[in-house]
């Protein structure tokens, strides 16, 4: 955490305090999934985070088009990054749902299916790299929108757009954390127990 805070210019004490405050407000956000099965965690990711990302990207797209009709370099750049984020995420979610998750569930059920990707570490590394790209895009969008804060006198559409982007970012943080630091390590550990030569997983921290 110290390195991440230093890189973002945030005092660690403030970050810890904010986390503790959020835990008091909504403890369900911080449920410990480490003891759950891959099947239960994957189901949660699909029905909660994957569904939310798709719904919000579709909902925010027309708002983005409406808001960026007004000539403004930063808003135009924001639209470019949002379009890239949407394309990137939709492809990423499909890859997970059609390839990665089915393999993980089959492996947990006692199988080690034949694959075109070798060890599960290979698609997981790809997923983590794509998660990093999501983080970079969201950071850039936050910079372009003054931390998703609409200026005084901004229209209602712009306020709704920025609020939606902030909410999307918050959900993506939890989404990517659960995959990078719970689902993927559990999957690699399970595969390692079945195929001992597979490497142990590292821990990843997405910086938004």
Task: Describe the predicted segments one by one.
Residues 1-208:
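Small-residue-biased structural context
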